[in-house]
């Protein structure tokens, strides 16, 4: 596992965007051989999306031959609802880059058959072989996507009940009213995420400190689903200083020295 210890959340966004752009450019994607990118929603990746848009506008990366798969979607709110994850992605990223509409893959939270929708999504991912890079965030309780504590570490895309903690955290997007936050969502599984060639998780803020500690220094544990990253051959965690407060000093020092060349300029 790589840990990229930075100082501020804005640096996390810029580092992650530069990393994604480099991966895409090194891959040299074509229509027949697209780069497959997994994407999250929420507050944490906003800085990354902003930086990626800037790189695109500067001509430093193109998304014309990039296929995307999003992590999750709420059940029970319209696709055009301002807080649906479809709306989030178009408003904060897709509308500002050259991605082709047919290359955007999103879960449908309004289908009548959730099981069939989840199978369709897994099959679509498999049709591309694999996801080359999956970016994600992490919840205060260590969940990745909507894989809440006690989720199976081999789980696939499925319907999940959201914990009260998650709904409280997400209520900030619903005028602070938890009753407006959906109780269920469709989400990729931990196993789906681990199938990706590379996984990059962004961690910012002191509220995520215990989750980062569990991911880096703890044991692999289904109560902290982010800890499953320890099983991945190519996992990267990009974090700011407030999120590092529960890590041992020697842990931060070790990774700071190891990644010194890679964090210069950020």
From Swiss-Prot:
This one is known as: Glucosamine-6-phosphate deaminase
**Which terms under GO biological process does the entry name?**
carbohydrate metabolic process; glucosamine catabolic process; N-acetylglucosamine catabolic process; N-acetylneuraminate catabolic process
Gene Ontology CC: cytoplasm
The enzyme's main class, written as a single word, is hydrolase
Q: Which SUPFAM superfamilies match?
A: NagB/RpiA/CoA transferase-like
Q: What's this protein's family per the entry?
A: Belongs to the glucosamine/galactosamine-6-phosphate isomerase family. NagB subfamily.
Mention any Pfam family matching this sequence.
Glucosamine_iso
GO molecular function terms noted in the UniProt entry: glucosamine-6-phosphate deaminase activity; identical protein binding
- The primary gene name is nagB
Q: So, what pathway does this thing act in?
A: Amino-sugar metabolism; N-acetylneuraminate degradation; D-fructose 6-phosphate from N-acetylneuraminate: step 5/5
Q: What is its EC number?
A: 3.5.99.6
Q: Where is this site: Part of the allosteric site?
A: 151, 158, 160-161, 254
Query: Per the entry, what modulates this protein's activity?
Result: Allosterically activated by N-acetylglucosamine 6-phosphate (GlcNAc6P).
List the active site.
Answer: 72 (proton acceptor), 141 (for ring-opening step), 143 (proton acceptor), 148 (for ring-opening step)
Q: Which reaction does it catalyse?
A: alpha-D-glucosamine 6-phosphate + H2O = beta-D-fructose 6-phosphate + NH4(+)
Q: What does this protein do?
A: Catalyzes the reversible isomerization-deamination of glucosamine 6-phosphate (GlcN6P) to form fructose 6-phosphate (Fru6P) and ammonium ion.
Organism of this sequence: Vibrio parahaemolyticus serotype O3:K6 (strain RIMD 2210633)
Assembly, in brief, is: Homohexamer; trimer of disulfide-linked dimers.
Q: Which UniProt keywords apply?
A: Allosteric enzyme, Carbohydrate metabolism, Disulfide bond, Hydrolase
The signal peptide annotation in the UniProt record is none
């Amino acid at each position: 596992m790589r840990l990229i210890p930075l100082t501020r959340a804005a640096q996390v966004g810029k580092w992650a965007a530069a990393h994604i752009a480099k991966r895409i450019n090194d891959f040299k994607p074509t229509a027949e051989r697209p780069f497959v990118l997994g994407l999250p929603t929420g507050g944490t990746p906003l800085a990354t999306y902003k930086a990626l848009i800037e790189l695109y506008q500067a001509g430093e990366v193109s998304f014309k031959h990039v296929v995307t798969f999003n992590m999750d979607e709420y059940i029970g709110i319209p696709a055009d609802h301002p807080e649906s994850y479809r709306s989030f992605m178009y408003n904060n990223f897709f509308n500002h880059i050259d991605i082709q509409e047919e290359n955007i893959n999103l879960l449908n939270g309004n289908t009548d058959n959730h099981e069939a929708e989840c199978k369709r999504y897994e099959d679509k991912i498999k049709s591309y072989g694999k996801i080359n890079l999956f970016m994600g965030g992490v919840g205060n309780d260590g969940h990745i996507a909507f894989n809440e504590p006690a989720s199976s570490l081999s789980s696939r895309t499925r319907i999940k009940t959201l914990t009260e903690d998650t709904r409280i955290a997400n209520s900030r997007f619903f005028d602070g009213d938890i009753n407006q936050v959906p109780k269920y969502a469709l989400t990729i599984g931990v196993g789906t995420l681990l199938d990706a060639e590379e996984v990059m998780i962004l961690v910012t803020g002191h509220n995520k400190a215990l989750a980062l500690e569990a991911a880096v220094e703890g044991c692999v544990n289904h109560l902290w689903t982010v800890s499953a990253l320890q099983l991945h051959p190519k996992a990267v965690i990009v974090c700011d200083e407030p999120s590092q407060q529960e890590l041992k000093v020697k842990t931060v020092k070790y990774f700071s020295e190891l990644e010194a060349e890679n964090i210069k300029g950020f």
